[in-house]
Amino acid sequence: MRLVILDDYALASEWAAKYICNCIIQFNPGPDKYFTLGLPTGSTPLGCYKKLIEYHKSGDLSFKYVKTFNMDEYVGLPRDHPESYHSYMWNNFFKHIDIDPNNAHILDGNASDLQAECEDFERKIKEAGGIELFVGGIGPDGHIAFNEPGSSLVSRTRLKTLAMDTILANAKYFDGDLSKVPTMALTVGVGTVMDAKEVMILITGAHKAFALYKAIEEGVNHMWTVSAFQQHPRTIFVCDEDATLELRVKTVKYFKGLMHVHNRLVDPLLSMKKN
């Protein structure tokens, strides 16, 4: 497990974007070999998406041979609703890059058969060869995707009831009106993300500090679903200083001492430009 600690949100976002960029380029995707990327929503990845858009617009990165699978989607919210995760992904990322819309997979929270929709999503991931890199964020209660506290750590894509903490946290996107916030969602399972060849989790802000502590300094616990990734062979937690406030001093010192190693993963930033 790697813990990459950057000074602030902007630097953490840039490091994560550089890492994604280098992973895609080193994979050398093509028409017969697509790179599969798992993606989150929420406020945390926005900075990372902005940097990836920059790399695309500068000609350093193409998403032509990338397939994406998003973590989750609300149930019952129209696809074109401004707060649906379809809208979020297209407005904040997809419409700014060269991805084929057919290769951007997002769960359909309005499907007539939600169970079949979840099973189909798992099948599509398998047919794509599995996820190369799954990027995620977490909530203050340590949930990843919508795998709320108490979720099975071997769970698959399924319908979930949202915890009140999550509904309250999401109310800001719905004019503070709890009655407008969806109470159900489709989400990949912890096991779905664990199956990825590599997982990168973005954690920023002091309000996520206790969750980061639970994620890496205590044992695996289904009440803090992000802790499951202690057992993944290739997990990277990318955080800012504020997110480390609950960690032991020696933990922070140990991982900061490895930054020269971590920075080799993103420096130099690779490019798809032809020389």
UniProtKB/Swiss-Prot annotation:
CDD domains noted in UniProt: GlcN6P_deaminase
UniProt entry keywords in alphabetical sequence: Carbohydrate metabolism, Coiled coil, Cytoplasm, Hydrolase
Catalytic activity from the UniProt record: alpha-D-glucosamine 6-phosphate + H2O = beta-D-fructose 6-phosphate + NH4(+)
PROSITE patterns (alphabetical): GLC_GALNAC_ISOMERASE
Localization terms from the record: Cytoplasm
Catalytic site: 72 (proton acceptor), 141 (for ring-opening step), 143 (proton acceptor), 148 (for ring-opening step)
GO BP terms in the entry: carbohydrate metabolic process; glucosamine catabolic process; N-acetylglucosamine catabolic process; N-acetylneuraminate catabolic process
Keyword hit for Hydrolase: yes
Signal peptide (residue range): none
Function per UniProt: Catalyzes the reversible conversion of alpha-D-glucosamine 6-phosphate (GlcN-6P) into beta-D-fructose 6-phosphate (Fru-6P) and ammonium ion, a regulatory reaction step in de novo uridine diphosphate-N-acetyl-alpha-D-glucosamine (UDP-GlcNAc) biosynthesis via hexosamine pathway.
Protein name as annotated: Glucosamine-6-phosphate deaminase 2
Organism: Xenopus laevis
Source taxonomy: Eukaryota, Metazoa, Chordata, Craniata, Vertebrata
